[in-house]
Amino acid sequence: MVNFTVDQIRAIMDKEANIRNMSVIAHVDHGKSTLTDSLVCKAGIIASARAGETRFTDTRKDEQERCITIKSTAISLFYELSENDLNFIKQSKDGSGFLINLIDSPGHVDFSSEVTAALRVTDGALVVVDCVSGVCVQTETVLRQAIAERIKPVLMMNKMDRALLELQLEPEELYQTFQRIVENVNVIISTYGEGESGPMGNIMIDPVLGTVGFGSGLHGWAFTLKQFAEMYVAKFAAKGEGQLGPAERAKKVEDMMKKLWGDRYFDPANGKFSKSANSPDGKKLPRTFCQLILDPIFKVFDPIMNFRKEETAKLIEKLDIKLDSEDKDKEGKPLLKAVMRRWLPAGDALLQMITIHLPSPVTAQKYRCELLYEGPPDDEAAMGIKSCDPKGPLMMYISKMVPTSDKGRFYAFGRVFSGVVSTGLKVRIMGPNYTPGKKEDLYLKPIQRTILMMGRYVEPIEDVPCGNIVGLVGVDQFLVKTGTITTFEHAHNMRVMKFSVSPVVRVAVEAKNPADLPKLVEGLKRLAKSDPMVQCIIEESGEHIIAGAGELHLEICLKDLEEDHACIPIKKSDPVVSYRETVSEESNVLCLSKSPNKHNRLYMKARPFPDGLAEDIDKGEVSARQELKARARYLAEKYEWDVAEARKIWCFGPDGTGPNILTDITKGVQYLNEIKDSVVAGFQWATKEGALCEENMRGVRFDVHDVTLHADAIHRGGGQIIPTARRCLYASVLTAQPRLMEPIYLVEIQCPEQVVGGIYGVLNRKRGHVFEESQVAGTPMFVVKAYLPVNESFGFTADLRSNTGGQAFPQCVFDHWQILPGDPFDNSSRGSQVVAETRKRKGLKEGIPALDNFLDKL
């Protein structure tokens, strides 16, 4: 940190209008970390000489070795805008210094939970797209999440050096490439956004407004149309008119920017802009973007890359570029880097784009409050968040835990939305299961220390006001992964994050040396804390299971477990896939079960969900917290449920939120409400451990048809009803053609045309199928999209690379659940093999339990 003291940062923190919280998001390997470097180096935290190679935000050793970002890291930057630039900011501002909290997040699909955590604490996002390969599956996933969280995007087209040097594109082709990417991104924004009438207004990106940057992170240069518009305005102003005031100048630059993009043409003969592609005397005119922006850049590239010394020297003089003495003797690519870096420094262009176009916390929290806060929209906490008020009650969201150098302790990483958090402040620490007025998941504790996160360093700081991102010490014992910290007694929680992937791949781990078991258990606890996505489960058979999003994610988790969290050698099983149990038709008989004392009877049936309902429950479109009538209306309209039945949903399961439903369609049963809790408990138990092989159920609707109860309350207690309900639910599943569901990945593969055949071969061997194949316009690359069962995905990447000579790059992301073909009762089918394997692994009795165990006769 070169010229920056904590006191200086603390002073800017009070100016909420001048803070920008932003994350950098992109597809894997589109150059996020490299770009982040040029920002960091501009803001004066690493030495500029090293920018581009340091990858400052990749703090972990394995990140630097693998050249991928795994965890999201935070850095504060400081940038001062010149007086001229301040006029471009349309929101309120306070002075010319800006504090930018930047979070570099991973692009790998397996780590998209890290991205979700990063998005929650930011208000804006820099979306990086490789201009050669275009918008990919991960860009889309993350952008969709960002827009759902009401985060405003700006776009950066990275890797222009590749487009110019490798693909040797003509200016017009390059323009078309950019135009297409802008359109693709806007399609995503308009599909998932709320439109111009929504609370955020229009968030479409548009080069004319200056919300699109172009450049190369590796070479360290970038520009938006604003930079070139300023050059030309200055050039024309120098010819005749006198000095312009900052406001008029801004107006002129904005007019100029409108002319530099789209179907506008420039006539070099008389220096006039025209709207038609032909000049009055019929010559074809060049497009302004090509003539006035790309052409100068090509003119810089051409003499330098062809080693024409005299031309190069003239050019450097004309552009008024002052090279360092050591740069003067370079030639070829190194010289090109030096010249472009001086002429169009990436840091300036991007930081200007960020400060001018991304919202400050004051602006953003107005429209994000309803998404962030679960409580009523007019209580003290909500008002404090809406106005980002440092005098309001403290409201802070912890989005993840960051491991410290001290083994086993974590910093809680999060953002202050209202009030001020300070060292020693007594706060209420509320976990995700806290409900106002109850005591569970609530701790009253003082905060030991507040710290600033600085990439590889932390700096202690006295207190931090709202709108800022901060780390806390001494909170980690009371929270698992996320939570809310507040001083307001009646505060509700901040809303829990929705992850776009679900943990479907599991590994069993055990310590090589049995004496190390306590260390392993402790290590698993820490692992669950440090990664927002991972689940650690202890099976009844006593084995420890780690569930993650995919092979790479699990590999990193196991490495962390072995080296950082447990510090012991570990044995691990092969990865196994979670399955779900479901039914494929309605139960063929009405199932009856009697309680152990034979005095109570339950009658039920099971039937499958209509298509799409399970996904709606996963997304939270239909949930237990919803208002009853609204939910009934939704189910009746979209899925044609009977309205009366839709109103009588008892609960969702497993865990009260899962994709199974228990409805009550009984008529006039006495004492029904007294046993409701017991039946619900039995339902939660049965859906968590299904009848086939004790996996979760999915997409099953159970109807309670009739109940006969004993008149005495003592004979219908929980001990009688819960096991009965469970047996009855199992019976109704087994009579409804039960099936297994397996998780399916969506695979996107980028490859050159000649190896597409090899890809089909690999996918067919692994039960995958291709459903879309398209060529990336303007390049020789093909994009193949396919569905691939997760079970077959282990070693898929290696297999694919060996069959295509390493030219195909797959990206797998969990997409949906699909029914495994074949009846699990038929011994030759795939389903029955899976059931047998799973039962054996879990140490259950062989063979699916017989129906007679669950079904009683009258």
Curated annotation (Swiss-Prot):
Domain of life: Eukaryota
Cross-link Glycyl lysine isopeptide (Lys-Gly) (interchain with G-Cter in SUMO1) per UniProt, renumbered positions: K239
Disulfide bonds: none
KW Flavoprotein (keyword) present: no
Residues with Phosphothreonine modification: T54, T57, T59, T435
PANTHER family reported for this sequence: ELONGATION FACTOR 2, TRANSLATION ELONGATION FACTOR-RELATED
Name under which the protein is recorded: Elongation factor 2
Organism of derivation: Cricetulus griseus
Taxonomic lineage: Eukaryota, Metazoa, Chordata, Craniata, Vertebrata
